[in-house]
Every structure is written in structure tokens, then in C-alpha cells.
Curated annotation (Swiss-Prot):
The gene is rpmB. One of its GO terms (biological process) is translation. Pfam families: Ribosomal_L28 (PF00830). InterPro entries: Bacterial_rp_bL28, Ribosomal_bL28, Ribosomal_bL28/bL31-like_sf, Ribosomal_bL28_bact-type, Ribosomal_bL28_sf. Keywords: Ribonucleoprotein, Ribosomal protein. NCBIfam families: L28. PANTHER family: 50S RIBOSOMAL PROTEIN L28 (PTHR39080), LARGE RIBOSOMAL SUBUNIT PROTEIN BL28A (PTHR39080:SF1). This is Large ribosomal subunit protein bL28.
Length: 63
């Protein structure tokens, strides 16, 4: 799966989009991913990280 966070493994989820008239349509939600350079085991590496992990400080950014 390409749209997965490399830190927390958050990926696509599916469910129903419900209109005002209560009609149901299947849809998917994707995580808000950003490509960042992060320090992994002392070396910089390019990762796909969700914004929740970026904001909570789970990723050490490389400069």
C-alpha cells in the first residue's frame, strides 16, 4: 500500500458517504501524508509521514 504512514502505519479506511437524503455511497479516506527527510538510525532518510506524527514529535526532522 502506497498511502501509508511510515511511522504509525496509518492507511486508507473506507466507509459510507451519507447525503442529506440519507443515500449511502462507498468512499475512502486517506491519511494526510507529507514527504519529509527524517533521521532514522543516525542517517537522513525520506519518509512518508502523516501530519499527526509530525505534530506530536514522533519524527526527528533532518535539515
Amino acid at each position: 500500500m502506497a498511502r501509508v504512514c511510515d511511522v504509525c502505519q496509518k492507511g486508507k479506511v473506507s466507509g459510507n458517504q451519507v447525503s442529506h437524503s440519507n443515500r449511502h455511497n462507498r468512499r475512502t479516506w486517506t491519511p494526510n501524508l507529507r514527504k519529509v527527510r527524517a533521521i532514522v538510525k543516525g542517517t537522513p532518510k525520506r519518509l512518508k509521514v502523516c501530519t499527526r506524527c509530525l505534530r506530536s514529535g514522533k519524527v526527528e526532522r533532518a535539515l
